């Protein structure tokens, strides 16, 4: 089949639109509202619904947030990063604040309940007290790639997870997924069972915490089901993701082939 000149031009325009459309959608801000919760030092809370503990209080320098059910996603949204900016130009900066999701919370038609540090970061210099006096503000937000983790680099493609202190070698294994590169949510975790030659699903306990009783002996191979912010779901694999003699409290990093969208 051959195209004439006008058909070729139209074809090029349509293909270009199909390529660029997901990028344009991904960079669009969504209107919402934000408020903040109180803490003694302005940082986050160690008791957040994601199960991060003390890590969830200080990660990203305390610029953290509880989010609505729609963004929490039954725990799959834990660790996601968003740019949030206030829509009052007289009180707020243009860039706003980049936050990490560490908790679940519903406010007055809000999608974000920010830590005090994060809410103050929305404000222009010397306008933070005025902004906080409002209590709730109109904002807009968009999903962004996470770049807060100490070992993160723009070209890295990693999943960072910690063996929960509640784990009991070798009878009970619980993992907390701390960081995922790009704009990916982890929606399933499975372990390879060498004895039965099949994958066995871990259970999402709550938030970012996954567990399994009687895990496989020896080095453990994991696979993670990731879902991008545009809804594409795929699996990534990590051989020997957890060593044979694993210990509670240890953290590991799986170098995997995640889709890293800008």
Q: Where is each model-derived feature located?
A:
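Folded extracytoplasmic luminal domains of secretory or organellar precursors
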Residues: 2-262
